[in-house]
Amino acid sequence: MILDEIIKKTKEDLKKRKADYPQEWLGRSLAYNPYVPRDVLGALRASKSEPIKIIAEIKKASPSKGMIREDFEPIKIAQEYEQYANAFSILTEPHWFKGNIEYITQVRRYASRPILRKDFIVDKYQILEALVYGADFILLIAKALTQGELKELLEYAHHLGLEVLVETHDASDVKKAVFAGANIIGINHRNLDDFTMDMGLCEKLVPLLPNGKIIVAESGLYEYEQLRELSKIGVDAFLIGEHFMRQDDIKSAVKKIKEGE
């Protein structure tokens, strides 16, 4: 299963990074960290004036689709997203997604929206990295972690001032996310084990969530009508990457899917 492969490789890479730059050193660098986490909850919670919130993804490739965007310039992409997106998601996984954590720092210098570090996070070291490089929130995948691990990592992120998007794909994941104390819960239409899609998943899982949670729909989203219908059942925000990455005019694509124009 691809998720298991990615997690295994992530742990191997992490071992090398810890040897090269120990966690203690990373922690010390926080004393000089110029980045203060921004208001993620405010950015993502839907309102009457803005019922559809967009997390626009900066993504070069994926294991399911291969290379998505050849002319990949993270700063330029972020600047095109800036006007209509409410937050950015930046892939930092290097092998399958061709990501780089340096992209977070680059984008933060030139754009003002909160930034999600989207990676396969399994260790506190990666959360410290996210903060040092300028992220405002991180992704934790419920299926990749035990209940105890999820709760521990989520609480550590909150302790550092970072928010957490906990990604789910079934009722068991949702229970884990709620028990761990997640404020933001993502529902990924794509199964990370076999890449199959279930576009009806939000309708099944949203009713299981307590009031007050920020709900994010992920994967397979490419038109305004989808977002409008999902917003009616309680989805606050929509994480969209591949659709935008395949556009020549990214800015117009974000406006169209958000406003239906």
Curated annotation (Swiss-Prot):
Pathway: Amino-acid biosynthesis; L-tryptophan biosynthesis; L-tryptophan from chorismate: step 4/5. It catalyses: 1-(2-carboxyphenylamino)-1-deoxy-D-ribulose 5-phosphate + H(+) = (1S,2R)-1-C-(indol-3-yl)glycerol 3-phosphate + CO2 + H2O. Its EC number is 4.1.1.48. One of its GO terms (molecular function) is indole-3-glycerol-phosphate synthase activity. InterPro entries: Aldolase_TIM, Indole-3-glycerol_P_synth, Indole-3-glycerol_P_synth_dom, Indole-3-GlycerolPSynthase_CS, RibuloseP-bd_barrel. It comes from the Bacteria. Keywords: Amino-acid biosynthesis, Aromatic amino acid biosynthesis, Decarboxylase, Lyase, Tryptophan biosynthesis. SUPFAM superfamilies: Ribulose-phoshate binding barrel. Pfam families: IGPS. Disulfide bonds: none annotated. Transmembrane segments: none annotated. One of its GO terms (biological process) is L-tryptophan biosynthetic process. HAMAP family: IGPS_B. Belongs to the TrpC family. This is Indole-3-glycerol phosphate synthase. The lineage of its organism: Bacteria, Pseudomonadati, Campylobacterota, Epsilonproteobacteria, Campylobacterales. The gene is trpC.
